[in-house]
């Protein structure tokens, strides 16, 4: 597979609407790299994991690319280099992606004991796209580690795995969406400042069945339940239940695929904001949860989500903005 990599067909493609922003704003402190992990019941064999990555990467056009700089926009080009090396985890997670140290790829695969880690520069894909790739990587690894699996399941991608790379923002864009994002200064949590590239991690494990039951009792979804708990925790631990002239704001990513019948493996999400304005003392948890849930439900619907991303796409399609050289775009983005 590694010998064949140099003969891959060279293709180029545009970044999706959201992806255009990430190469411009990525820094050592705000890397725009996310991590997905999967834990097996056995120790990881790094050589087999490398073989699995070598095998599936050419199948995923959304991951098998390098980032190029054009006159007006960044763009993707097929990466003909061998797949990035699988490494034993030894650094902070979610470090800034350094393509020149990674065969020009924009993702990393590492392992630690029984865990497989996939770190992705958001320019490639959102969490759902990353999950698709990680699941197939794990499946291929298990086929290599346990050949009897091939006898039962075959040596091919799951029928549920999408390789679609459409820009679903452009496909579902609707003209005449005048509203943009509204923002205001929000309350900022304070704490010990880590050095650049350092990343603090707190791992918590919850029994899914009990979380589902707790959310069901309160007539909310799991996402709404966790968002409400998070907002209430900030309110109690940082504001101590006091009045604040700055609101507590949660930015919640929403997977747009179910609303627009998309199966893309690229970015297709929108951000909505749930705002708690502490204009009185001692909100109860129920009161905070009600405010957060109502804010989310008002925004997480097809009509509102369509307006959000259509506004962004309209800026990208603006002829005057498209004609501005990339070097100038980077100064204002």
PLM regions with names:
Residues 111-113, 216, 221, 245:
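Short, well-ordered loop/turn elements at secondary-structure boundaries
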Residues 37, 121, 199:
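Conserved short-loop catalytic and cofactor-binding motifs
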Residues 76-77, 165:
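Conserved catalytic core of two-metal-ion nucleotidyltransferases
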Residues 1-73, 81-108, 117, 203, ...:
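Acyl-thioester-dependent acyl-group transfer interface
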Residues 137, 141-145, 234, 296, ...:
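Short, well-ordered alpha-helical segments in soluble proteins
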Residues 1-17, 112-115, 124-132, 136-213:
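Non-catalytic, low-complexity flexible loops and terminal extensions
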Residues 41-59, 119-135, 203-240:
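Acyl activation and transfer enzymes in specialized metabolism, enriched
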Residues 77-82, 120-124:
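Secondary-structure transition/turn motif
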